[in-house]
Amino acid sequence: MATRNRTLLFRKYRNSLRSVRAPMGSSSSSTLTEHNSLTGAKSGLGPVIEMASTSLLNPNRSYAPVSTEDPGNSSRGTITVGLPPDWVDVSEEISVYIQRARTKMAELGKAHAKALMPSFGDGKEDQHQIETLTQEVTFLLKKSEKQLQRLSAAGPSEDSNVRKNVQRSLATDLQNLSMELRKKQSTYLKRLRLQKEDGADLEMNLNGSRYKAEDDDFDDMVFSEHQMSKIKKSEEISIEREKEIQQVVESVSELAQIMKDLSALVIDQGTIVDRIDYNIQNVASTVDDGLKQLQKAERTQRQGGMVMCASVLVILCFIMLVLLILKEILL
């Protein structure tokens, strides 16, 4: 069952409550009202913490209100706090999975280097560690892929563009991580096969020495038995290497399936850049058209009938004023 840690959110609400209640009374009454508001006591003194319909991404977005009802004066000292949408939690969870996968991949690289080093032991512990780390990384990648599909399946909303950008970014990071793991596994597989070929050459040399030693004296039989023990040990190592190679091949196949699923979610960065350039060009052309329309409207306003009428009226008023002055002078 999936759970979410709300300790930080609780502390945020508690600190907000303290800052609001501090100027309203003494420290003792503030502590009492804080306890009553958080525990739901019927005191009527504490404020109500209410999750109202506000958003961190869009102030016009509405969410389901969650409030603690106080039977007393609940309208006094109300604190309004907005909650982010659900897909933000999903994206944060995917980011945590990707970070854990990166850490495990670093440990896996060290385990690969340690397992490929020549040693006198059987290497079962290193192989078990490699197998465990590979399974953990693959599990984290699959879980991230499922959460990413859940994020892409979210319905349309007012912040869908932000959600799509976050989805593309996480999908790109997940694809790069899968490619890196696939490359590590392929390199490890090649080096294992190379060591296997070297072991086969060593076995052939030991077999030749054993056949040659059969014609020697009885004193050389002890050395021949020692060679036989080496051959058996080499055969056991070859069998273990075969198992390791098979496990690596299976993990590479799983990674190939993950890459195939991610290819449907990742959008090429060049396409995004082209889309941005296209939008910028559209904005530039729209601004140019708007400027032309404004200039045309200005010319039309200057040469319109209203301007002509106003000009004629001003001229007539001036003529009438002159005639009035002349009339007064002559009479």
Swiss-Prot record:
GO BP annotation list: chloroplast organization; defense response to fungus; Golgi organization; Golgi to plasma membrane protein transport; Golgi to vacuole transport; intracellular protein transport; protein secretion; salicylic acid mediated signaling pathway
Gene3D superfamilies: 1.20.58.70
SUPFAM superfamilies from the UniProt entry: t-snare proteins
Main location: Golgi
InterPro entries linked: SNARE, Syntaxin, Syntaxin/epimorphin_CS, Syntaxin_N, T_SNARE_dom
Keyword Glycoprotein: no
Transmembrane segments: 306-326
Gene disruption phenotype: The double mutant syp42 syp43 exhibits severe pleiotropic defects, including short roots, a large number of lateral roots, semi dwarfism and early senescence. Plants lacking the three genes SYP41 SYP42 and SYP43 are seedling lethals.
Tissue expression pattern: Expressed at low levels in roots, stems, flowers and leaves.
Domain t-SNARE coiled-coil homology per the UniProt entry, residue ranges: 235-297
Regions of this protein lying in the Cytoplasmic compartment: 1-305
One Gene Ontology molecular-function label: SNAP receptor activity
Topology of this chain in the membrane: Single-pass type IV membrane protein
Regions of this protein lying in the Vesicular compartment: 327-331
Family: Belongs to the syntaxin family.
Subunit-level organization: Part of the t-SNARE complex.
Function: Contributes to the regulation of secretory and vacuolar transport pathways in the post-Golgi network, and to the maintenance of the Golgi apparatus and trans-Golgi network (TGN) morphologies. Vesicle trafficking protein that functions in the secretory pathway and mediates liposome fusion. Required for extracellular resistance responses to a fungal pathogen. Also involved in the protection of chloroplasts from salicylic acid-dependent biotic stress.
Name of the protein in its database record: Syntaxin-43
